[in-house]
Each structure stands twice: as C-alpha cells, then as structure tokens.
C-alpha cells in the first residue's frame, strides 16, 4: 500500500497502478463464469491515440471492468491493423526524411516490405503504449496484428473459399482511384468536400445537318425563347473528360429534345459521332437539361453506360494524365459470371473480349495533367466557337483523405466479392434480432446499405498487405489457391509452366471482416481450441462509430455467418463522433485535433503548436493553425489525468449523436476527482484508530471474498445515505445494461459529489463530534462502508483514483484483498433499506430546509461566518417534529443563533422569506445588512443589466445581423441574452426580498 498524499496528483500513481495490474495478470480471462467478450476495432499500426479511439476505448474498458467485477470471464481482444495505404505512406515519408535516397521503387517489393517490417518493430506498438496510459485493461498477451501468421492464413482461406464458391471474381469496373497513391481506395477513404467550381456550357453540333426548334418557358409557362438550333448545349463540370464521351443524354419526357433522341452529334475536338440517348437519370432543370455521358470517368455515367450498353473510353491514365492512345471497350461489365473452380479463368475478361478499336488522342493533349488538359480543351473549344458559357457552380468534390487529391473514377481490372446473397443473409440476421443495434434506429441505416449493396472491390495496388493468392501463367489464365504449390498440384502444372503471383494486395477491410474469428484461431482447429473459439464467439458487444456500420460491421456479420455459422457479436453499440467544442470534425488540416495524452499528461503551448503544424498535407495552413491554437490554449494544456478524461468521455456518451468535446468539462471532472480525494482524506482522518478492521466487523460474501459488515445505522443521516446508495447501485446496473454511460456518470457524480461529499459528510459531523459514542461509531462505519462501495461503483469509469483510494480505505473495513479491480461490483440487494424510508424522507426535508436558507444567505450576501436568526411560522405537526429532531444539525449547518416559532397571528419583522411546504422560514434583516444601501446597489445593477438586454434584443431583432453574421456569432449573442436574463431575474428576486 502506497503512502497516501494530501493532494490529488494523478501522475504519482496512475502509471504505477497500471504496471501492477498488468504484472499481476489481472487483465487475462479467468476461465470461469459467464463469458463476456469485446473486440477492439483494430487501430492502424501507423496511428497514435486520437480522441475517437479514447472515446470508444474508455467505454469498452468500462464495460470490461464492470463485467469482470460482476464475476464474468472477460476477454478484451485487442490488436492492430496493418493499414496498407497509411503504412506505405509513413514508411516512404520516413525514408525521404532519412536522406539516403531510398524510395519504394528503388528498394523493390521485397526490400520495401522488409523496410516496413523494420519500422513496425521499432514504432508499431506506439498506440498500444498509449492505450495503456488511458487504462485499457485488455489481455495484451493475446494482442494480434492483422499481418501475423494466423490472421494471414485466415485471409488466404477466406479468399480461396469464396473464389471456389463463385463469390470472388476479377473484372473491369469503375473504382475510386487516387492518382498520387496510384491505387483503388474505399468509399470510406474519400471525403466529399463542398467547393466552388464552374459549370461550362459546350456546343455539340448535330450530325448530318439536323436542326430542331428550341423553345424555352418561364416559371409561369410563358414562352420566352423560340429559335432554330443545329447543336445541343451540354452542361458539364469536367470538360477534361470530353474526349471519352460516348453519348449525350436528355430526359425522356423533356419536350425540348424528344425529337432528337436517337440522333447523333459530333463530339467536339474529335469528330466522333455519338448518340443522343434518353434516361430518367437526367435532371431537366440542371444546366440545359443535356449532359454528356462519359462511362469510364463518372460513377453515374458508368451505370448509364451499362444500361444502354455504351462503349467506354478511358482517356486518363493512373496518374490522371491524358493518355496518348486508348481502346474502346464494350459497355458490358466484366465479371458478370463466376469463374469455374477447377478451370483457370482468363486473367482479365475485359482485356480479352471487351476491347475494340484503338483511339489516338490529340497529340497536343497527350501527357497533360487533367487540369492542364482542362485549360487546353477549353481554349480549343473557345477557338472553335464551341464554348458557350462558364458560370460559377457549387459542387461536391471527392478528395482522398490521405493525399487531399481529387479522386478519379477509374476503369481498371480489380478483384471483387459478389455481395447480393451475403447481404441478404446479413440483413436477415439483424432483422430477426440475432444482432441488436443500440440505439435501434441504426438498423435503418444498416438496412438501407444492405438493400442497396454493390459488389465489393477488394484489391489494392500496393505492396504492403495480404498479397492476393492468385497466379497468372504466360497466357493470362489465373489460378487461385492457398499457395503456388497447391495451385500446381491441383492443375497439374509442371515446372515448365511459369506462374507469376498477382502483384495486388487485399484491402485492409478484407482482413478486418474476419477479426471476430481469425483472432480466435480460425481456420486452424488446434489454434481455435487454444484460443477459446467455442467459448468466446460470438462476442458480447461491438463498440464502434456509425461511419463504419457498412464498411466493417456489416462485413463482419456477413463473413462470420458465412464461415462459422455464427454471428460475430450479440450487440452493436453505435457511438457518436467526437467533434471539437464548436461542433467541427477534428482533423489535421483544421488544426483542431486534441491528443488524449496531452489532456492526460499536459503539453506546453509551443509543443502543442509544433504538433499541430508538423507534417501537414497543406503546409500553407500552418500559420493559421498556429494562430488559432495560441488563441485557444494560451497556456498550453494542463495535465488532467486519465480518470478526468475517462469520466468526461462517459458523461458525454449520449446515444447516437455527435459529441462536442469541451476541455472545460475535463477540468470539471478533474475537480470531481479532487473532491473524491479530499472526501476520502476526511473519512480516513475521522476513522483513524477505529475498530472496524477487526474480524468481527466483516463477513464472507457469496463469492468467498471478504466483504465489509453491513452497517446498522443509528442516525437518520446514515439511513438516508444507505437508501440512496442502494438506489444508485440499482441505477448503475441498469445504465450499464442500457449502454447509457452518460446517465451512469451523471448518477454516480450526483451521488458522490452532492449526496455523499456535500450532504452526508456534513451531516455526519455533528454525530462524529457529539456525545453519543454509539452514534459516532456507527457513523464512522457507515462513512467507510459507503465510501468503499462508492469506489467500487466508480471503478469501471475512473479506475486509477478509485484503486488508489480503495487501498487506503479497505483495510479500515477489514478487507484483505489487494486490488479493487477484482472486487465484486456492488449489488442493490446487499442493502435492505425499506425500513429506512421515514428517516430518508426526513433527511430530504432537511436538505430542502437547508438549501432554502442558504439561498437567502447568498441572496443577501451574508458572510458564511455570520450567524443568523431563524423564525418559523405555520407548518404541520411533522414540521415541528423535524425541527426539534434536527435542531443540532440545523444550528451546525446554517450557523444559527436561535430558532423561534411565531404564531399565525404574530406580525413578523422585516425578513427574507422562504417557503417549505406550508412552513414559512423568516430571516430577520435587522442588523444583518444595510437595507437602504443594498436596495440602491441592486437598483443600479438592474438598470445596467436591462440595458445589456436591450442591446442584445436589438441585435437579434435585426434581420440583417441574424441572416448575415456567422452562425457562431449569432448563437453567442443568444447565449449572452440568456445569461443576462437569468442574471436579471436573480437581481429582481433579491430586490423583492428587500
């Protein structure tokens, strides 16, 4: 047991306690009790702990600690994800900083992968060290890396099985393409950013001298224009892809163009003839109602192209530059039928059968970057009189979340998983309740995604990751197997047949979908037995954000069901997303990221600025970010400790909403920890030398552990606090079951701060200092008992301070155990408080009395040390009994000189008044304050505040201000008005009192 210090300093014990817990093996599954399993969403191995991690991991840790204390066999499975793209970027950047001239390409595939493994050994466990600092009580001996041998074997097995079942195929389709990374990326890695752009109107001449009568109308239906035209005006935001157009499109019911459907136009700059088609996808009111169709460079156009069997012409290469020549491909999606399992398939059906004539691009455009090409194409169009107009236009621009580059829809050969049958089963499992969403409204999001699912692109053009287990021969046939040896044996391929493994790797979500069962040894029977596959699958709950319900949650449900016949988890608890205090998403580019460790351990202003401005994708933002940081944190961030951060997170964890993280809340909960520390010091000082530690003062619990003897209260205050303890214990269990961490934190905070620290500690003082030795002894025991129980209730949320304090309190109750984290969680049935109802009601009445009189003191600015008189009038018999019963407590708590009763007919002197039920409380003013001076002061202050309210109302009634000022400024003014109004009401109340 450590030396108990006089002040709360989390740095003095948090790291020490964690090391003791881990060394003792307290985080490992016990192997007895009901299994309770949580899967940690594996963070990127490249990453550091961010607020989203801290938020979810705090809630997971609270659940694990709670169930561990409830006697469950808890397994918290942790690990890290290999993070293909992110890791390649980090290692490449590090090589550049080393200045040796090494690059990914100069090292080659094998050399670069070796470099990644070196980096992983040196830096890959950073995030796990940070998780320990937060207090994560996971079994680190089972920590898994997605590139470890066991998960890698699971990935290969899953790929081969799905391929053999016809669920995996290789085909030519449109994907998200990052032209800097030169790889396909997932939708989750694309951020759609609203930006200001242009909408260009381009003239596409009708072929063969065709003309039409163009008519326009205003909103009222009046004809505003009638003219004969020989071309269609096409509106586009991407003129650089014009070279790949294979049609122009109108709405079938747009009367302006119905006569032209089936005709052709001449594609500008190329002379190619393309058809005018109709499709309901067109919005007639957008631009001119005529749009170009470029199936190889737009996702919507791609779908149109498939519906109309349009050819697809790819005009950009993998770096988003104009190609010199290209092939016209048929508008039939490749991979539409599954490959057979015993016969090798064509490696790329689209290359074999979907390609036709070769097109030569204009020589002066070939090799140009897409934006340089845009400028040149617009200039060429203008020179030919084909550029009609350019108007400002707001559009959603897809940007890669890592490079910031505009993502290209890119037609390329990739591997895909057929999702239709898998999704139908995944939806069925949720609909029938095999998997429960909390809150339940997220089922609607899940259902929408599953009912509109597309085939999943699983290949990535990277080196780091699980290499696709497919081999090509020199004829382009593909063979899939667990190894090259298996492929050769299965297909009788001799050594004379050259096989080359596919260069691509699987995207990280492919391995992540297997996480629930690959971490339990699948598919190796021996590993499954060793790691508890049957015992720990399904897991109990998945805690995750709504942004990956489809990308991860749905895929785990589908894959786990398909490969194991089980669900991956029973509950999915969906959390909100952590945002900054203004509600903005935290991001490096915004410069508003908060590092949880900086909140825990503190950081200087200079270090904080350096952290926020180093390694920016857009260095030009550094000055702006530094300025904002210095304004928000002029003194840096003070250390708060892990517990203050954890309690803040729990208190903010409302269901399914975005979470605004305000550092001021963390400061408030640091004060809460300090309050708990000081209350414990008070209890320990007032129970020193007490006999509660003797064997007669404790008893064996049902689990065999020694538990403190239940108090036999002798005072009303003891009976009240014990009844409140039973109630808050029941509520804690209910809120854990409902995943309402916010309500749990609120209930425990209210009990600890208000009821135990503020009320019971104060109510205990008369008994502790009184002449009744039995009441004093009973009160000391109850203080210890309630505090020890409270520490157990709080432990899942704030484990460090509760452990440190409990180690001081437990011996006073005769408890021999050495750690709080393995103690039983309090149960409400352990306290029978029915007999305490009357005493509890009396104390609640006392609290109302004391609060009312304290408000009078505050209103009149009476110093705390100044004694006051109390006159009572009216009331019931029960009020008289309670006044007599609590006379000592009232004198002690309120600094009363005397208490007198007035008859109903006696005129009361000038007094401040409060009402409790039918009882009138009067505090005589004579000699207490200078009434005339206080009236004058209040009148002056009331006028000042009324003036401020008038100013604020003037601003908010000004429509120009409300409509044009930034939203934050308007809201700030409304907040000021609310504050001034509250202040005015208080001033008027005090004035009325006088």
Curated annotation (Swiss-Prot):
Cellular component, GO, one term: cytosol
Annotated domain remarks: ValRS has two distinct active sites: one for aminoacylation and one for editing. The misactivated threonine is translocated from the active site to the editing site. The C-terminal coiled-coil domain is crucial for aminoacylation activity.
Function summary: Catalyzes the attachment of valine to tRNA(Val). As ValRS can inadvertently accommodate and process structurally similar amino acids such as threonine, to avoid such errors, it has a 'posttransfer' editing activity that hydrolyzes mischarged Thr-tRNA(Val) in a tRNA-dependent manner.
Top-level taxonomic group: Bacteria
Keywords for the protein's UniProt record, in alphabetical order: Aminoacyl-tRNA synthetase, ATP-binding, Coiled coil, Cytoplasm, Ligase, Nucleotide-binding, Protein biosynthesis
Residues that coordinate or bind ATP: 588
Coiled-coil regions listed: 928-994
Segments for region (Disordered): 332-356, 691-713
One of the GO biological process terms: valyl-tRNA aminoacylation
Chain intervals with Low complexity compositional bias: 333-353
SUPFAM superfamilies: Anticodon-binding domain of a subclass of class I aminoacyl-tRNA synthetases, Nucleotidylyl transferase, tRNA-binding arm, ValRS/IleRS/LeuRS editing domain
Enzyme Commission code: 6.1.1.9
Family: Belongs to the class-I aminoacyl-tRNA synthetase family. ValS type 1 subfamily.
Protein name, as recorded: Valine--tRNA ligase
Placement of sequence motif 'KMSKS' region: 585-589
Chain positions of motif 'HIGH' region: 43-53
Annotated source species: Xylella fastidiosa (strain Temecula1 / ATCC 700964)
Reactions the enzyme catalyzes: tRNA(Val) + L-valine + ATP = L-valyl-tRNA(Val) + AMP + diphosphate
Keyword Coiled coil on entry: yes
Gene3D superfamilies: HUPs, Isoleucyl-tRNA Synthetase, Domain 1, Valyl-tRNA synthetase, C-terminal domain, Valyl/Leucyl/Isoleucyl-tRNA synthetase, editing domain
Alphabetized GO MF terms: aminoacyl-tRNA deacylase activity; ATP binding; valine-tRNA ligase activity
Subunit relationships: Monomer.
Localisation: Cytoplasm
């Amino acid at each position: 047991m450590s030396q108990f210090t006089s002040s709360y300093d989390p740095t003095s014990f948090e790291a020490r306690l964690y090391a003791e817990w881990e060394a003792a093996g307290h985080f490992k599954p016990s192997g007895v009790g009901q299994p309770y399993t949580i899967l940690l969403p594996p963070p990127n191995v490249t990453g550091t702990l961010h607020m989203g991690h801290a938020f979810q991991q705090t809630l997971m840790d609270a659940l694990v600690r709670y169930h561990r204390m409830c006697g469950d066999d808890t397994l918290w499975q942790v690990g890290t994800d290999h993070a293909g793209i992110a890791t390649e970027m980090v290692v490449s950047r590090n090589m550049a900083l080393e200045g040796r001239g090494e690059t990914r390409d100069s090292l080659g595939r094998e050399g670069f992968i070796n470099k990644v493994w070196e980096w992983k050994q040196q830096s890959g466990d950073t995030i796990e060290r940070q998780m320990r600092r937060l207090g994560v009580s996971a079994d680190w001996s089972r920590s898994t890396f997605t590139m470890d041998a066991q998960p890698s074997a699971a990935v290969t097995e899953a790929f081969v099985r799905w391929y053999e079942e016809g669920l995996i195929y290789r085909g030519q389709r449109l994907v998200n393409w990052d032209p800097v990374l030169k790889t396909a990326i997932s939708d989750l890695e694309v951020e759609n950013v609203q930006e200001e752009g242009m909408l260009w109107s381009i003239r596409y001449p009708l072929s063969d001298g065709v003309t039409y009568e163009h008519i326009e109308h205003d909103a009222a239906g009046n004809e505003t224009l009638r003219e004969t035209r020989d071309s269609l005006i096409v509106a586009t935001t991407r003129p650089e892809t014009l070279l790949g157009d294979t049609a122009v499109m109108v709405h079938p019911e747009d009367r302006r163009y119905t006569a032209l459907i089936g005709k052709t136009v001449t594609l500008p700059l190329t002379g190619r003839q393309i058809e005018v088609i109709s499709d309901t996808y067109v919005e007639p009111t957008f631009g001119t109602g005529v749009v170009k169709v470029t199936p190889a460079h737009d996702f919507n156009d791609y779908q149109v192209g498939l519906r109309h069997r349009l050819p697809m012409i790819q005009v950009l290469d993998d770096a988003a530059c104009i190609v010199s020549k290209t092939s016209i491909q048929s508008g039939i999606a490749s991979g539409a039928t599954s490959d057979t399992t015993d016969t090798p398939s064509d490696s790329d059906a689209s290359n074999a059968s979907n390609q036709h004539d070769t097109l030569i691009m204009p020589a002066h455009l070939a090799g140009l970057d897409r934006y340089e090409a845009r400028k040149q194409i617009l200039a060429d169009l203008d020179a030919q009189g084909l550029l009609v107009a350019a108007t400002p236009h707001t559009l959603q621009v897809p940007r890669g979340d890592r490079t910031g580059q505009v993502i290209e829809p890119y037609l390329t050969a990739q591997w895909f998983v057929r999702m239709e049958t898998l999704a139908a089963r995944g939806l069925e499992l949720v609909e029938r309740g095999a998997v429960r969403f909390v809150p339940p409204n997220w089922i609607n999001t899940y259902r929408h995604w599953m009912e509109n699912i597309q085939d999943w692109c699983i290949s990535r053009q990277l080196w780091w990751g699980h290499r696709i287990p497919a081999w090509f021969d020199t004829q382009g046939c593909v063979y899939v197997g667990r190894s090259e040896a298996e492929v050769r044996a299965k297909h009788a391929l001799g050594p004379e047949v050259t096989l080359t493994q596919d260069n691509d790797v699987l995207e990280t979500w492919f391995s992540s979908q297997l996480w629930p069962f690959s971490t339990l040894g699948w598919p190796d029977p021996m590993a499954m037995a060793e790691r508890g596959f049957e015992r720990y699958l399904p897991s109990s709950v998945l805690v995750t954000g709504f942004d990956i319900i489809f990308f991860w949650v749905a895929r785990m449900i589908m894959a786990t069901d398909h490969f194991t016949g089980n669900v991956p988890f029973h509950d999915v608890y969906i959390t909100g997303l952590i945002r900054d205090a203004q509600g903005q998403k935290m991001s490096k580019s915004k410069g508003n990221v908060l590092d949880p460790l900086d909140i825990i351990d503190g950081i200087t202003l200079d270090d904080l600025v350096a952290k926020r401005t180093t390694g920016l994708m857009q260095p030009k933002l550094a000055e702006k970010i530094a300025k904002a940081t210095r304004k928000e944190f002029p003194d840096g961030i003070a250390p708060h400790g892990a517990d203050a951060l954890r309690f803040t997170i729990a208190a903010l964890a409302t269901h399914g909403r975005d979470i605004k993280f305000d550092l001021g809340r963390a400061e408030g909960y640091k004060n809460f920890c300090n309050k708990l520390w000081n209350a414990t010091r008070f209890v320990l000082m007032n129970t020193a030398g007490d006999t509660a530690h003797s064997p007669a003062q404790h008893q064996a619990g049902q689990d065999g552990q020694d538990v403190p003897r239940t108090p036999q209260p002798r005072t009303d205050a003891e009976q009240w606090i014990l009844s409140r303890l039973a109630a808050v214990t029941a509520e804690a269990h209910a809120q854990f079951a409902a995943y309402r961490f916010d309500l749990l934190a609120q209930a425990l905070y209210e009990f600890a701060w208000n009821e135990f620290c503020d009320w019971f500690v104060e109510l205990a003082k008369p008994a502790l200092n009184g002449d009744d030795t039995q009441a004093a002894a009973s009160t000391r025991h109850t203080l210890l008992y309630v505090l020890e129980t409270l520490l157990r209730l709080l432990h899942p949320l704030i484990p460090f301070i509760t452990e440190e304090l409990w180690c001081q309190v437990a011996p006073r109750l005769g408890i021999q155990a050495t750690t709080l984290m393995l103690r039983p969680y309090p149960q409400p049935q352990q306290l029978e408080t029915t007999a305490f109802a009357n005493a509890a009601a009396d104390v609640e009445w006392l609290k109302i009395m004391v609060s009312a009189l304290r408000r009078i003191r505050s209103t009149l600015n009476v110093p705390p040390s100044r004694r006051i008189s109390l006159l009572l009038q009216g009331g019931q018999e029960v009020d008289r009994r309670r006044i007599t019963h609590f006379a000592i407590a009232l004198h002690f708590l309120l600094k009363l000189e005397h208490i007198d009763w007035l008859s109903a007919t006696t005129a009361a002197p000038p007094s401040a008044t409060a009402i409790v039920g039918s009882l009138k409380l009067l505090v005589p003013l004579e000699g207490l304050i200078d009434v005339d001076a206080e009236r004058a002061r209040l009148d002056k202050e009331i006028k000042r505040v009324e003036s401020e309210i008038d100013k604020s109302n003037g601003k908010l009634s000004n429509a120009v201000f409300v409509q044009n000022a930034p939203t934050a400024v308007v809201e700030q003014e409304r907040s000021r008005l609310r504050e001034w109004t509250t202040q005015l009401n208080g001033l008027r109340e005090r004035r009325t009192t006088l």
